[in-house]
């Protein structure tokens, strides 16, 4: 029997809009992205791949991550959970944060001089690392790559899991890691 195809198909070599877009993520029948308008204001939008309809779902610059049911957003002062179906949004944590990632059923976020881990409802929040200013967190399977600055050691690059076990990368390892990441 022929393979079942969705009602939409991936469009090739077709311009979908003229917006300046960042952080493009495809999830099911939607493409989610950050858009910047002429006044340099950011918003989170999604485009339906079936009818190419675009809707603004959040009116601030943010980082966002998607799982089966929710979109998790960080706007720098709070972490929010948005239902993908009805777009209902609730704050799960009021916290200044520099960056965050979603790993399985955990949210890892950096604030001030700490890296914390909490569950998807904002509970069980605990510190993974102290005395570190994380500039960048990226998911690598079940692990997280962190670029930052430690008060005791200066510039740091490491890989850690959501339990806080980490492996420091030296200069040569970092270059190799970046090459693998870009592959």
Question: Model-flagged regions — what are they?
Answer:
Residues 1-16, 39-56, 78-93, 114-130, ...:
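Surface-exposed loop/turn elements that mediate protein-protein interactions on large endomembrane-trafficking
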Residues 19-27, 59-68, 96-104, 132-141, ...:
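Repeated scaffold domains used in trafficking and secretory/extracellular systems
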Residues 27, 40, 67, 75-76, ...:
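Short loop/turn segments that connect beta-strands within the blades of beta-propeller domains
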Residues 92-103, 107-111, 116-117:
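Eukaryotic tandem repeat interaction scaffolds
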């Amino acid at each position: 029997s022929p393979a079942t195809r969705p009602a939409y198909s991936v469009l090739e070599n077709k311009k979908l809009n003229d917006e300046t877009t960042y952080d493009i993520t495809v999830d099911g029948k939607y493409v989610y992205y950050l858009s910047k308008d002429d006044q340099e204001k950011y918003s989170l939008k999604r485009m339906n791949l079936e009818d190419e309809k675009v809707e603004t779902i959040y009116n601030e610059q943010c980082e966002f991550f998607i799982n089966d049911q929710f979109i998790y957003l960080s706007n720098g002062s709070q972490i929010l959970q948005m239902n993908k179906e009805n777009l209902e949004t609730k704050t799960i944590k009021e916290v200044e944060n520099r960056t965050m990632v979603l790993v399985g059923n955990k949210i890892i976020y950096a604030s001030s001089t700490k890296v914390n881990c909490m569950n998807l409802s904002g509970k069980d929040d605990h510190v993974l690392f102290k005395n570190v200013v994380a500039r960048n967190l990226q998911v690598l399977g079940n692990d997280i790559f962190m670029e930052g600055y430690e008060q005791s050691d200066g510039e740091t690059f490491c890989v850690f899991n959501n339990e806080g076990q980490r492996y420091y990368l030296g200069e040569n390892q970092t270059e190799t890691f970046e090459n693998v990441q870009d592959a």
